Amino acid sequence: MAFLKKSLFLVLFLGLVSLSICDEEKRQDEDDDDDDDEEKRGVFDIIKDAGKQLVAHATGKIAEKV
């Protein structure tokens, strides 16, 4: 009976260790993905701001002609 308990505890311990390692790798992968998303947002913000300035400049030119 003691042998079965020790074996069971060993299996559970090794399972918990492997789960924690997998969780750490998953968090690292998610952090890497977050960095990519931030870069994409940064580029989109630059394009959006340039578009706003272009529209403002164009509407200013149209208002001057009228």
Swiss-Prot record:
Where is it localised? Secreted
Q: Which UniProt keywords apply?
A: Amidation, Amphibian defense peptide, Cleavage on pair of basic residues, Secreted, Signal
Q: Which InterPro entries match?
A: Antimicrobial15, Frog_antimicrobial_propeptide, FSAP
Top-rank taxon of the source lineage equals: Eukaryota
Q: Name one GO biological process term.
A: defense response
Family the UniProt entry places it in: Belongs to the frog skin active peptide (FSAP) family. Ocellatin subfamily.
Protein name, UniProt field = Ocellatin-PT2
